[in-house]
């Protein structure tokens, strides 16, 4: 039985890579050529022609009033926080189970990140934990819509109103996902999106900031464009020290066609997710995270989250099962995707470099500063992340995924 598993020398179920990356049609390539031949590749004049076209298209699809394309998603978060009036020393509450860029964007503006635990059902930020963490220094809440889940916006917005806080939605995973029929990113005071290379929409790198308030938008435009305060975005008082965080015309050109193709690809992913979930449920040990919350009116499938149950796999740990699946040609991720943020080696914050944290954390932020048991359990034991590249191809791809899972399940004793 041992030899059947590819991990021990058997033949893998799949040897071909899954399809990945954007699909460029001839019209998309023409648009890119037009930019290359225009002689105007960068962000000046700001916003440049293709940037304007994409911003109008993306905001129109989201139902957002204002938006600006920027260099990347972390930049989008930092710019949004400053544009919303978060200052040095202000506390910003966010989730302990996210990519480090969410919290790093807070540190980068000399504000103080406060990490709280996640809801055990959705693995998004727990509203009760948010409210418990509020202090007189709290200025903002940054919920993350994680994978195919959406944070409880009703509860979070109610808390924000009660305590006079701003809400910045981190929608890096959630392009065009909907809460109560409205796209995420448009419920809070601002929303941030990512177009990094792994995302369902990508320009290699890139980010987008949306807001419903003109002054917030004008401040963001100025911050992105080196602090310039030019006609069209000069309604706010004073000046702000900005950076060059402009996106290029090529980034905008890459993205326009992906908005046009989104619904077709989304339908394919949705169908494949349904097939995968049905098959994994039949095999056992992989339960979809979350529930059928009627307030979630459209999910996105950048990643799909499952909860692993070792009791249905003869007590074998998730990581060992995922190792065997990888050998079969199917990459599901666990701790390699997101460790809990307070234990992430990439998120190293000391008062020597970022003095505003000293009052709350002393010389450095460390694991001892946080109690995040749900985040730790999800990261180290339960979470299984399935990337959209496994879900955008034909249904036969899902058949092979399920074949691999079933094969590993048949041979689970060999993994003990």
Swiss-Prot record:
Gene3D superfamilies: Aspartate Aminotransferase, domain 1, Type I PLP-dependent aspartate aminotransferase-like (Major domain). The keyword Chloroplast does not apply. Pfam families: DegT_DnrJ_EryC1. One of its GO terms (molecular function) is transaminase activity. It is an enzyme of class 2 (transferase). The modification N6-(pyridoxal phosphate)lysine is found at residue 199. Its cofactor is pyridoxal 5'-phosphate. It catalyses: 3-amino-2,3-dideoxy-scyllo-inosose + L-glutamine = 2-deoxystreptamine + 2-oxoglutaramate. Pathway: Metabolic intermediate biosynthesis; 2-deoxystreptamine biosynthesis; 2-deoxystreptamine from D-glucose 6-phosphate: step 4/4; Antibiotic biosynthesis; tobramycin biosynthesis. The keyword Transferase applies. One of its GO terms (biological process) is polysaccharide biosynthetic process. Its EC number is 2.6.1.101. Keywords: Aminotransferase, Antibiotic biosynthesis, Pyridoxal phosphate, Transferase. InterPro entries: DegT/StrS_aminotransferase (IPR000653), PyrdxlP-dep_Trfase (IPR015424), PyrdxlP-dep_Trfase_major (IPR015421), PyrdxlP-dep_Trfase_small (IPR015422). Catalyzes the transamination of 3-amino-2,3-dideoxy-scyllo-inosose (amino-DOI) into 2-deoxystreptamine (DOS). Belongs to the DegT/DnrJ/EryC1 family. L-glutamine:2-deoxy-scyllo-inosose/scyllo-inosose aminotransferase subfamily. This is Putative L-glutamine:3-amino-2,3-dideoxy-scyllo-inosose aminotransferase. It comes from Streptoalloteichus tenebrarius (strain ATCC 17920 / DSM 40477 / JCM 4838 / CBS 697.72 / NBRC 16177 / NCIMB 11028 / NRRL B-12390 / A12253. 1 / ISP 5477) (Streptomyces tenebrarius). The gene is tobS2.
């Amino acid at each position: 039985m041992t030899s059947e598993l590819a991990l021990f020398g058997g033949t893998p179920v799949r040897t071909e890579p899954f399809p990945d990356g954007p699909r460029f049609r001839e019209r998309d390539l023409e648009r890119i050529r037009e930019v290359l031949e225009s002689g105007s590749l960068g962000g000046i004049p700001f916003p440049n022609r293709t940037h304007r076209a994409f911003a109008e298209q993306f905001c129109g699809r989201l139902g957002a009033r204002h938006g600006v394309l920027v260099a990347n998603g972390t930049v989008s978060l930092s710019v949004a926080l400053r544009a919303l009036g978060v200052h040095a020393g202000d506390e910003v509450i966010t989730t302990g189970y996210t990519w480090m860029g969410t919290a790093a964007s807070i540190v980068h503006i000399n504000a103080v990140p406060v990490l709280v635990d996640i809801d055990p059902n959705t693995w998004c930020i727990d509203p009760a934990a948010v409210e418990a963490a509020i202090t007189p220094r709290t200025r903002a809440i940054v919920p993350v819509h994680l994978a195919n889940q959406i944070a409880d916006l009703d509860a979070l917005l109610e808390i924000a109103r009660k305590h006079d806080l701003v809400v910045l939605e981190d929608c890096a995973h959630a392009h065009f996902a909907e809460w109560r029929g409205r796209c995420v990113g448009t419920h809070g005071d601002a929303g941030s999106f990512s177009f990094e290379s792994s995302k369902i929409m990508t320009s290699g790198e890139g980010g987008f900031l949306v807001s419903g308030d003109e002054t917030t938008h004008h401040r963001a435009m100025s911050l992105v464009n080196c602090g310039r305060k030019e006609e069209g975005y000069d309604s706010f008082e004073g000046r702000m020290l900005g950076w060059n965080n402009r996106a290029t015309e090529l980034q905008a050109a890459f993205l326009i066609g992906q908005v046009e193709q989104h619904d077709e690809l989304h339908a394919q992913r949705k169908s494949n997710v349904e097939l995968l979930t049905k098959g994994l449920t039949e095999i056992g040990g992989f339960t979809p995270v979350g529930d059928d919350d009627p307030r979630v009116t459209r999910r996105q499938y950048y990643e799909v989250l499952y909860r692993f149950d070792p009791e249905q796999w003869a007590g074998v740990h998730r990581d060992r099962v995922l190792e065997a699946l990888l050998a079969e040609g199917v990459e599901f991720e666990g701790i390699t995707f997101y460790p809990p943020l307070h234990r992430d080696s990439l998120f190293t914050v000391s008062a020597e470099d970022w003095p505003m944290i000293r009052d709350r954390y002393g010389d450095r932020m460390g694991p001892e500063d946080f109690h995040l048991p749900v985040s730790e359990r999800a990261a180290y034991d339960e979470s299984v992340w399935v990337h959209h590249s496994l879900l955008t191809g034909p249904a036969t791809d899902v058949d092979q995924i399920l074949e691999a899972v079933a094969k590993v399940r048949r041979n689970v004793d060999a993994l003990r």
